[in-house]
């Protein structure tokens, strides 16, 4: 009679009682569901406390896209806010870029999350804000430029949405994988200036009083997916239709290849980026730079020839849209101005399709040259 094979059960490395259901990618620790929830949430809490991201009474907007990262972020922040008594008022802030078949479906998920988490929801539309949808921008500027436009417009839309809600802090679901990808992208481009921003857990737009932070800075994407799966969270999993053409996709594939050989490479890349930033800062404070006047200092010459040094006040505004900007024209307005140059051509093509060539011919006959 053939003996039955006994299947060995792997126990959790923490409680040593329950069956392990996952192995952590960062340290290969085997955990059961409950211990995984505890470790996952505690690490994020420690990140928030160490970076001093919040203070009691803060009104915080969660950048909600309906994807796994922002959905897990909303769930975890709600849990931590109640468990550790942060004293935060949490709201959901969504940006509708106007991508048919993608954003409209993901916003339906956000609206369900609003009910599940009992949080107010504000939706800011590109079309309402800029008079352009992302689909229109891509048809005009091409798919390869989509992330350039969307990144700039989205950052400003988040700031405008937060200002509308009288919020001074926005949290986003950028995770450790995203951070490592951005470090790689900036290194491949040779863009050390942007490296500091990509490694920082707390950032803000130039001239804007609104802070943006990334509580998931040290959280692996795989663990976020597992948390959403085991908690049975409602999220939208389809990738943006324009994302495959982005340069980030190249960095992502490179990161996956590196991770398969060295699982700790994600954290290693983030730490390396932070050390490069420190080295870059030290270089800027050498004697070569010390005697140069600082950009944020104004000199005022008195009648007796003495000089007063005063700091420039923040709050410069774009001459076109009136939004906070360190330049006369903000980057969003520069990009939109380039799009507007092609707007008449788009309109003529639309009229031709709808009303035929007769109207166009009649218009041309009325023109005087």
Swiss-Prot record:
Superkingdom of the source species: Eukaryota
Naturally occurring in which organism (per UniProt): Meyerozyma guilliermondii (strain ATCC 6260 / CBS 566 / DSM 6381 / JCM 1539 / NBRC 10279 / NRRL Y-324) (Yeast)
Protein role: Plays a central role in 2-thiolation of mcm(5)S(2)U at tRNA wobble positions of tRNA(Lys), tRNA(Glu) and tRNA(Gln). Directly binds tRNAs and probably acts by catalyzing adenylation of tRNAs, an intermediate required for 2-thiolation. It is unclear whether it acts as a sulfurtransferase that transfers sulfur from thiocarboxylated URM1 onto the uridine of tRNAs at wobble position. Prior mcm(5) tRNA modification by the elongator complex is required for 2-thiolation. May also be involved in protein urmylation.
EC number(s) from the headed UniProt entry: 2.7.7.-
GO-annotated cellular components: cytosol; cytosolic tRNA wobble base thiouridylase complex; mitochondrion
Gene3D superfamilies cross-referenced by the UniProt entry: HUPs
Pathway: tRNA modification; 5-methoxycarbonylmethyl-2-thiouridine-tRNA biosynthesis
One example GO MF annotation: tRNA binding
GO biological process, one term: tRNA wobble uridine modification
UniProt-annotated location(s): Cytoplasm
Main localization, broad class: cytoplasm
Descriptive protein name: Cytoplasmic tRNA 2-thiolation protein 1
UniProt entry tagged with the keyword rRNA processing: no
Similarity field: Belongs to the TtcA family. CTU1/NCS6/ATPBD3 subfamily.
Keywords recorded for this protein, A-Z: Cytoplasm, RNA-binding, Transferase, tRNA processing, tRNA-binding
HAMAP family referenced in this protein's UniProt entry, alphabetically: CTU1
